[in-house]
């Protein structure tokens, strides 16, 4: 339990930031899920369109320290590789 007023304020700030980050993380995961569903269905055009939306979401999340930048790059790389395999 926070005792000082500054600690109480820090607790409030953390709660607000956590709520914002949770929302952004959910939005990012949703956009990635759409790409994965398009890949699973074999629809290359839909996957490319979804990827065009998902990649900026991932990189924005990395920039805002919601996920690690290497994790974002790895996810983009794996999704791109999966889409490329659809063309073959």
UniProtKB/Swiss-Prot annotation:
RNA-binding among keywords: yes
GO BP term (any one): translation
Domain of life: Bacteria
GO molecular function, one term: small ribosomal subunit rRNA binding
Any matching Pfam family: Ribosomal_S20p
Keywords: Ribonucleoprotein, Ribosomal protein, RNA-binding, rRNA-binding
Region annotation Disordered: where it falls in the sequence: 1-28
GO cellular component: cytosol; small ribosomal subunit
Entry similarity comment: Belongs to the bacterial ribosomal protein bS20 family.
Function: Binds directly to 16S ribosomal RNA.
The name this protein goes by in its record: Small ribosomal subunit protein bS20
Organism: Rhodopseudomonas palustris (strain ATCC BAA-98 / CGA009)
